[in-house]
């Protein structure tokens, strides 16, 4: 039996392409995850492995859908082989089982390239964040209140205006107002 496994890293990505390819290949059952490959817990993959029986083949669209790094891929494929389950990657067109030396060689090569590609992506992302910080951008949501708002907020609070009223004025929660007040108090304490 051919058992498919599909994975996307974020909720913004879509499984349709992978599932279509797995169906075209003849997979009778498809398991999936919406989770980064860097996470060790992948319930869909775990269910696919539990479901697979000796003689079955687990099929993925691309090798990088299966694992975080070369060591994980090798461990996983060895586990499958020990259970008598083979593995096939559609894009790389490799089948891995104990009987195929060529399949083992290709698997190790493609696993190394998949890990290399992931590391490049991580390096680029890190470099991008560092460059953004150097330009004064720190990511995350923009602040709700600017410096002028904070000055007015502090004045209103010091004059006894209720937190609820202050929060309504800026259309934010009371928690947000308290967070800004704590931030202001911390700044004042640092300045002393």
From Swiss-Prot:
A molecular function GO annotation: DNA binding
Catalytic site positions: 9
Annotated keywords: DNA integration, DNA invertase, DNA recombination, DNA-binding, Plasmid, Transposable element
Protein name (database record): Transposon Tn552 DNA-invertase BinR
Organism: Staphylococcus aureus
PROSITE patterns listed in its UniProt record: RECOMBINASES_1, RECOMBINASES_2, RECOMBINASES_3
Family: Belongs to the site-specific recombinase resolvase family.
Cross-referenced PANTHER family: DNA-INVERTASE FROM LAMBDOID PROPHAGE (PTHR30461), SERINE RECOMBINASE PINE-RELATED (PTHR30461:SF2)
Lineage: Bacteria, Bacillati, Bacillota, Bacilli, Bacillales
Function: DNA-invertase, mediating the inversion of inv.
Entries under CDD domains matching the protein: HTH_Hin_like, SR_ResInv
DNA-binding region: 163-182
Residue ranges occupied by any Resolvase/invertase-type recombinase catalytic domain in the UniProt entry: 1-136
GO terms (BP aspect): DNA integration
């Amino acid at each position: 039996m051919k058992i498919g496994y599909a994975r996307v890293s974020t909720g913004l990505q879509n499984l349709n392409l992978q599932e279509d390819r797995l169906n075209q290949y003849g997979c009778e059952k498809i398991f999936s995850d919406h989770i980064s490959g860097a996470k060790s817990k992948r319930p869909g993959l775990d269910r696919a492995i539990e479901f697979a029986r000796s003689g079955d083949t687990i099929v993925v669209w691309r090798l990088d859908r299966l694992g975080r790094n070369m060591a994980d891929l090798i461990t996983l494929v060895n586990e499958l082989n020990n259970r008598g389950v083979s593995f096939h990657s559609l894009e790389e067109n490799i089948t891995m089982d104990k009987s195929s030396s060529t399949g083992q060689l290709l698997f190790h090569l493609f696993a190394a390239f998949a890990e290399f590609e992931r590391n490049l992506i991580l390096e680029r992302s890190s470099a991008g964040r560092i460059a953004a910080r150097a330009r004064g951008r720190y990511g995350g949501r923009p602040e709700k209140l600017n410096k002028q708002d904070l000055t007015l907020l502090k004045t209103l609070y010091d004059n006894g205006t209720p937190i609820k009223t202050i929060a309504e004025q800026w259309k934010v929660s009371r928690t947000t107002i308290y967070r800004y007040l704590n931030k202001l108090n911390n700044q004042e304490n640092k300045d002393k």
